[in-house]
């Protein structure tokens, strides 16, 4: 049943079944506990695979019909008001909010929101602040950054966030992210940075592609 769910690209079911194998040592555990279904955005745009998979795993457990008590919808659990802002379409915050259950639209807007947050002067491409803003909101990130005394220590910053929900969210999504990076044989520069007491800067797959292309020309 577990292998069938994995092969049939049923990530939500595979993840639930895979959680039963935590102590079994099964070779299937990585692919079921950390599913990696194909991701396609509405406009066919490039998605930052490992980061989006990490967010989806925590937000919706790969259930495209997930809806939170606060009203967040879809794979990436986008709030209708946020989706309307990102899409510049107020209808998504109102009568058309259920369109957010469309996986391709949800992924498209989720990726755009990631890009918006990464470009925010308060975040500056930092993974800790990005995930804090994603879960707690940019306004709370700004407030907590002013009030929390962390002496520029990234781990102290996370542990000092007043919201327990946001602290746990950041820790779990980062864990997911690094596991997906390992699974896909990707560098772990952000994890190494945290180990050295540095802020983990996020480099998107698009930025990596540019760097590789530039290295090839040199």
Segments from the language model and where they lie:
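Catalytic glycan-binding domains that act on GlcNAc-containing polysaccharides
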Residues: 1-218
């Amino acid at each position: 049943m577990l292998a069938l769910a994995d092969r049939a690209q049923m990530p939500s079911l595979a993840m639930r079944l895979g959680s039963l194998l935590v102590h079994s040592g099964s070779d299937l555990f990585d692919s079921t506990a950390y599913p990696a279904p194909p991701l396609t955005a509405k406009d066919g745009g490039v998605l930052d695979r490992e980061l989006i998979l990490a967010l989806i795993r925590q937000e919706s457990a790969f259930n495209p019909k997930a809806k939170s008590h606060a009203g967040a919808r879809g794979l990436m659990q986008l709030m209708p008001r946020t989706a309307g802002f990102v899409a510049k379409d107020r209808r998504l915050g109102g009568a058309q909010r259920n369109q957010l259950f469309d996986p391709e639209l949800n992924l498209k807007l989720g990726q755009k929101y990631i890009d918006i947050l990464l470009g925010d002067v308060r975040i500056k491409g930092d993974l800790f602040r990005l995930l804090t803003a994603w879960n707690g909101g940019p306004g709370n990130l700004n407030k907590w950054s002013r009030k929390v005394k962390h002496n520029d220590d990234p781990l102290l910053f996370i542990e000092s966030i007043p919201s327990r929900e946001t602290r746990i969210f950041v820790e779990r999504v980062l864990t997911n992210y690094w596991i997906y990076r390992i699974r896909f044989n990707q560098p772990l520069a952000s994890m190494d940075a945290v180990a050295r007491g540095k802020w983990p800067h996020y480099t998107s797959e698009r930025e990596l592609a540019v760097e590789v292309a530039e290295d090839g020309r040199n």
